[in-house]
Each structure stands twice: as structure tokens, then as C-alpha cells.
Amino acid sequence: MNKTRNKILNQCETLMLDMDGTVLDLSYDSHIWLKIIPEKLAEKRDIPITSAISFMNEHVIRMKNTLEWYCIDNWSKLLDIDVLEIHRAEKERIRYLPGAKSFLQEISNSSIRVILVSNSHRDTLNLKLKETDLGDYFEDIYLSHDFVYPKENPLFWRELIAKE
């Protein structure tokens, strides 16, 4: 580790990391949510792709910062599309961000407790764990679905602190 990072981390007992966009490349999720799902919705409803995108955007705005937004079961029901199956079909796109794996390897050799804290749905987390060795680097994994609040809600953090 470089000296500045090492100095900061030497003062750290526990390091909480997010998964998507922090450790794993967000392009996997972006591809699914911004391209594949709107295409599937347009095809299923026989509507223009722009209408499918508008429909999704309306619901994104309505559900933003809620657990519904992160729940693939909710989206599957709303869209009448198997969202988990789409995630599985695109699994070859799951990858670490550049430098993330080497950072995790380095930090796992330290005395710092590393935990994953994510808004991910359990099923998509399990898929990502299966496709990577990500689970090897974390002592604990906490999901917002387990606490019934998204990370954006202060109650999530209260529940997490109580559990810790």
C-alpha cells in the first residue's frame, strides 16, 4: 500500500465498503438497467424503447431512496420480467474495478476488519459472490434488505450499529 493510504488505514479498525461502483464495476448493473431491461420491457409490451425508458424513469423517481428501488422482486413484479434471470444471463460482465482486487488482497493481510455494506438484493449479491471471489475478502456482509431500510435512511445505520 502506498504511504498515505497506509497511514490512514493504520488508524482504522473497521473498513466498510460498498460493492457496486466501489469494488465491482458498475457497468454490469448499468448495462442491465439502462439497456437490457428497457429493451425487454419494450419487447414484452410491444412499445417503443423510449416509452419503456419513460415508464421505468417514472418508477425510479417514485421509488428513489426506498428499499423498493433496490428490490429485484419488486421490479420483476412491476415489469413482469424475470430480473434475476437477466442478471444471470449477463453474469460474464461482472468484474472488479481496476485496482479493487489488489486493494482487497492487501487490506485482507492487515489487522483491519473489512465488511461489505450494500443495498444489493440478496440474489444479485449471491450471483456476484458466485462469479467472483469477493466474499473471501469480507468478515461480514450486511445488506439493506436485512435491515428493511436502504442505506440512505439513517435507520439503516442505527440498525447496523445495534447489530455490530
What do the predicted segments below correspond to?
Residues 8-10, 109-112, 163-164:
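Glycine-rich phosphate-binding loop signature in dinucleotide/nucleotide-binding domains
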